[in-house]
Amino acid sequence: MNSLCKSCANVREVVSGTGSAFLLCQLSKFDKRFPKYPPQPVVRCDGYEDEIIATTNYTLIVLPGSFSICRLDAEAPVPEWASGEISSITRTPDELSIVCSQDDVPDGIRCETGWRCLRLAGQFDLSEFGVLASLTKPLAKAKLSLFVVGTFDTDYLLVKNTELDSVVQALTTAGHTVQGI
């Protein structure tokens, strides 16, 4: 099917309440650039998942080095080795999670190693929506796992080092730019 809008994934055949079948761009539900058809209610939609899709393409920067995702007991103090240039510390009633450079983690710590970190370039207002969805959706479609860390200004995607090439391919195919490879 020829695309009627930016992504053929948004075009679906629908059947109206009167039984007429036609193609409809689902972006028309929230994007004013697309016409809203039909005037009658849709009673069946073949496969469309009602979701908001960000229409912005983003730039991600692959940071140097490998990272680890570590788990310590909930009551453990924050260790000194978790204070590198890039690190994230999250405490919950169940655990203390630390994301940091793989080189900083001492032996004997429960962790998963071999992660690469992609930083979302720029600063984003906390009220912006669809940013992570536009980045994670192509990875989910490609069956690629990730771990996300957010800060006040931006987000970081951690992906397995063995999947980095596939992640870059999925993101660039979706229209995003990946630098620092």
Kindly label every feature range from the protein language model.
Residues 1-51:
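Cysteine-centered metal-binding/redox modules
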Residues 51-138, 166-181:
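Regulatory modules associated with amino-acid/nitrogen control
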Residues 129-162:
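A structural feature that tracks compact, well-ordered secondary-structure segments
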Residues 16, 110-112, 142-143:
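Short, flexible segments with low predicted structural confidence
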Residues 21-23, 41, 68, 96, ...:
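Short beta-strand micro-motifs in enzyme catalytic cores
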